[in-house]
Amino acid sequence: MSVEHATPVQQPAHAAASVRPVMILAGGTGGHIFPGLAVAKVLRARGVPVTWLGADGAMETRLVPQHAIQIDTLAISGLRGKGIVKLLGAPVRVMRAVRAAGFVLRKRQPRAVISFGGFAAGPGGLAARLLGVPLLVHEQNRAPGMTNKVLSRFARRVLTGFPGSFAGEEAVGNPVREEIAALPAPATRLIGRGGPVRLLVLGGSQGARALNNAVPAALAALGHPAVDVRHQCGEKLRAEAEAAYAQAAVNASVEPFIADMAAAYAWADLVVCRAGASTLAEVCAAGVGSVLVPFAAAVDDHQTRNAEYLVSAEAAVLLKQDGTLAVRLQQVLQTLLADPARRLAMAQAARTLAKPDAAERIADIILQEAGNGKSGMGNGQSTEQLQEHTVIHQNKRTDQALDAASASLHPIPDSRFPIRTSAGGAQ
C-alpha cells in the first residue's frame, strides 16, 4: 500500500511550528481513546502539538480527527482469538507494523510517545523504544492489557488508573471531564435532598442488555418504590429497554445517550452501571455510590478487578452478571433505596478515590520525560541532527524480536509501508 499524504492539521495559534509534538498511541475502544484525548487537550492548551497513531478503520479514525488532531494509521489488528494459521503469521505482521511505525516516528519526530493501549500501540511503542524516543505507558484498568504489559518492560514511566496493576507504577488516575470533577461534594448535593430516590442506570454507548432486563425486574419486584429512574441504554437497545420497563410497569426516562454527564451525576443518588475504567473514574470524581455489574465477557475479566477496588473502599456493591442478577439486584436496591446515610457514605468514599487532576499529571510527566532524553529522537536534537541520526540505540535486554524489528527500521521507499495518514479537522 502507498502512503497517503495529507495537509497537516492546524494546531492552536499559540503552538509554534518549530515545537515538536507528543505522539499518542491509542485506539480500538473509547476506554483507550478518551483518556488520550483528555491528555491531548491539556498538552495543546500548553502549546504542545499532538499527533496520533492508530489502526486502519478503527474507532480512533472517526473520533480523533473531530478534535483537529492529525492521525496516522497502521494495517494492524488484534491477535487474541485468531486461528492457528493467523497466529503463526503474526510475528511477520508485527515486524512489518513496527517497521511502518518507525517510518511514522521518523516523519513526525515526536519529543515523546505515550501508549494508552490498542492495536497500534504495540508497534508504535516498540518503534519508539528502538529509535530512542522517550516512551511512557498509561494503563486504565487494574488488569493490564496485553499491549501495555509488553511495553511496560521498557517504558520510561508506567502510569496507571488504579493502584496494583504493575510493579513500579505511578497511580495517577484516569482522566475525566472537567465539569464532572468540578461537581460539589456529595454532602452538599445529597444531604437534605427530598422526594423519590434518583437512580441513574448507565449501559454505555453500546448499551447493556443485562441491565435492561435486571433493573426493571428488580424494581417491579420491590413493589414499585418511590424511585425516579434515568436509564442510558445505547441507541441499538433503546426499544428493548423501553419494552422491559413497560412490561414491568415501571416508569423510567430511557435515553440512548446522555450529552451532559456532569448534570446526570449531580442529579443521581445512586448509579447502577458496568465497571469500565472511565466510568468508574467518573463515578469517583462525581462522588456517587454505585452498584457495579461488570461485563462478563471483558478481556481478562478486567472490569471485575476495577470494581473490586471501589468495593474495597466501601464505595460500591459488586454484583456478578448471571441468571440471578435481577433477584440479587432487588435485594441490594431494597437496602440502599431505604438508607440515605449509607448512600452518602458510599458517595463520600468514592470521592476519596478520585484523581481529578489525572490529565494534568500525565501531561506533566510526559513533558518531564521529553526533556530527559539521552539519545534518539527524544533528546531535543534539531531536525537536521535527527535526519542524520541513523543509529538505533538498543538496550542489552532487548530480545531477538526487537532486534529483528530494529533491523527493519532503516529508511525504505514510502510505497512499501502499510500506512494511512489523515488530517483532522474541527467539526
UniProtKB/Swiss-Prot annotation:
Record GO biological process: carbohydrate metabolic process; cell division; cell wall organization; lipid glycosylation; peptidoglycan biosynthetic process; regulation of cell shape
Catalyses which reaction(s): di-trans,octa-cis-undecaprenyl diphospho-N-acetyl-alpha-D-muramoyl-L-alanyl-D-glutamyl-meso-2,6-diaminopimeloyl-D-alanyl-D-alanine + UDP-N-acetyl-alpha-D-glucosamine = di-trans,octa-cis-undecaprenyl diphospho-[N-acetyl-alpha-D-glucosaminyl-(1->4)]-N-acetyl-alpha-D-muramoyl-L-alanyl-D-glutamyl-meso-2,6-diaminopimeloyl-D-alanyl-D-alanine + UDP + H(+)
Pathway: Cell wall biogenesis; peptidoglycan biosynthesis
SUPFAM superfamilies for this protein: UDP-Glycosyltransferase/glycogen phosphorylase
GO terms of molecular function: UDP-N-acetyl-D-glucosamine:N-acetylmuramoyl-L-alanyl-D-glutamyl-meso-2,6-diaminopimelyl-D-alanyl-D-alanine-diphosphoundecaprenol 4-beta-N-acetylglucosaminlytransferase activity; undecaprenyldiphospho-muramoylpentapeptide beta-N-acetylglucosaminyltransferase activity
Membrane topology recorded in Swiss-Prot or TrEMBL: Peripheral membrane protein
EC number: 2.4.1.227
PANTHER family cross-referenced by the UniProt entry: GLYCOSYLTRANSFERASE (PTHR21015:SF22), UDP-N-ACETYLGLUCOSAMINE--N-ACETYLMURAMYL-(PENTAPEPTIDE) PYROPHOSPHORYL-UNDECAPRENOL N-ACETYLGLUCOSAMINE TRANSFERASE 1 (PTHR21015)
Function field: Cell wall formation. Catalyzes the transfer of a GlcNAc subunit on undecaprenyl-pyrophosphoryl-MurNAc-pentapeptide (lipid intermediate I) to form undecaprenyl-pyrophosphoryl-MurNAc-(pentapeptide)GlcNAc (lipid intermediate II).
Name the UniProt record assigns to this protein: UDP-N-acetylglucosamine--N-acetylmuramyl-(pentapeptide) pyrophosphoryl-undecaprenol N-acetylglucosamine transferase
